[in-house]
Amino acid sequence: MQKVSSCLMLVALAASVLYSVRSQAQVARSNGAGAVFVMNNSASRNEIISFMRTVDGSLQQAGRFATGGRGTGGVTDPLESQGALTLSQDHSLLFAVNGGSGEISVFQVHGSNLALVDKKPTGGAEPNAVAQFGGLVYVLNVGGSSNVVGFTLNARAQLRQIPNSIRFLTTNNSEAASLAFSPDGQFLLVTERATNNIDAFQVRPDGTLGSTVVNSDSQPGAFAVAFAPNGAALVSETGPASASNASTISSYSVLADGTLSPISAGVPTLGNANCWNVVTPNGRWVYVSNAASSTISGFSIGVTGALTPIGATVLGINPTGSSNLDIAVSADSKFLYSLNSGNGTIGIFGIQEDGTLVNVGEADAISAKSGFNGIAAF
């Protein structure tokens, strides 16, 4: 990825508004090997359900924490997004969207316990995803005049909307599904399902965004975007609506002007409805969730960002009808968790040294087909 001169100024901005990473990270591991969080997205009382992760990857429910807002309700995948529930880079904060009340909630993370510390309007309708980089937080509002809105994050984990930070997407009701910062914080990418566009915004030194650079995805069905640590942008694509097992994943490099250059275009996932992806913290693998097939596929990430299928590509199989939505990986890159809306479980898979998956069980503490969206883990 080419570099631009604003990088150093952006780092200075992030440092000036950044919350205390070290002090909060110290309390983020007060119990268990880690934690997993899911969001019920209830239209009456949006809540986060937390689980303590043990060393063998199994989960024990730890608590329920109200966001102070309302979700959208629904049945299966009502938010149609990746990133409705997002951990900060150091796992000390958890951000949750309240799609029904148009707000974002911020929690301090103490192991598997949460403390609500802030809640702010998102500056738009139906927020469905959030991304964080240092002291910057951007929220995706999918309803009406679809937009992204920026906030600064101070030492007390309080949000403040950045003046003139609203950027509208290329169409109203864009069905935008995800947003992600590049690893160096220079770019924010947003996927639009209605147009099959990937919008790129350069992040300015004051935290606002530059003009929209519109990129057409090389494959149909652009849904979720995530970045590998080496800077490659990884896009999950559902594929043609009428095709069977036609979902794909593509990787791109982001050039200095915001245009995307394909690296691996349309690598088959051998499943249906690949809408979500997750990159392991060690940067070696990316996994995708084929919701309509109830399967997980995996790919190794090369030094150039090229994608290579791991083994037979389909590595994890949930029970038929699971409708696995969002997926998350533990901080040690040893376990993958899938939010299975169809049967009301969290699927648990062990990640082997070669990237293959082993099914090690499931947790049963969520309600089937009740509108759950969003999962995060460390």
Spans of features found by a protein language model:
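A short beta-strand motif characteristic of beta-propeller blades
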Residues: A62-T76, A115-P121, I162-L169, G210-S216, ...
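Structural motif
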Residues: R45-I49, E103, N147-V149, N197-A200, ...
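Beta-rich, blade/repeat-based domains predominating
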Residues: V27-N31, G68-D90, T122-L136, R167-F187, ...
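Short loop/turn segments immediately following the C-termini of beta-strands
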Residues: N41-A43, R53, G99, V142-G144, ...
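Short loop/turn segments immediately following beta-strands, especially the blade-tip
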Residues: F51-S58, F107-N113, T152-L159, F201-T208, ...
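Aromatic- and glycine-enriched pocket-lining scaffold segments that form the walls
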Residues: Y138-D206, G210-A224
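Blade-level signature of beta-propeller repeat domains, shared across WD40, Kelch, NHL, RCC1
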Residues: S341-F378
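Residue position within the beta-strands of beta-propeller blades
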Residues: V38, A96, V139, V190, ...
